[in-house]
Amino acid sequence: MDTSLKKNNGALEADNKNYQNYKDEPDKISDVLDDTKYNSMVECCHKNYSTFAPQWDVKERNYIDVPEGPSAKKSIVHRCTII
């Protein structure tokens, strides 16, 4: 079994930071996921990942990524649905 993805601690830290941002500020709709620069899957017991999806849910709240800036380029990050 390939365990290389499990060793990507940087992705796990960045994703946990973003999850915490939404958890602490449930009304904040801005895309804090911009901080996540990794596009690999990470293992987490309380998350079910859907990679490269444009929308995701946190505690039954739905978030849609909105590109910002002059180029309006979508960032490639992982998304998750809390289960």
UniProtKB/Swiss-Prot annotation:
Residues of the signal peptide: none
Induction summary: Expressed in the early phase of the viral replicative cycle.
Gene Ontology CC: host cell cytoplasm
Region of interest (Disordered), ranges: 1-26
Keywords per UniProt: Early protein, Host cytoplasm, Host-virus interaction
Compartments reported by the entry: Host cytoplasm
Functional description taken from the UniProt entry: May subvert the host innate immune response by interacting with host IL1B and interfering with its function.
Family assignment from sequence similarity: Belongs to the asfivirus L83L family.
Quaternary organization: Interacts with host IL1B.
Name assigned to this protein: Protein L83L
Organism annotation: African swine fever virus (isolate Pig/Kenya/KEN-50/1950) (ASFV)
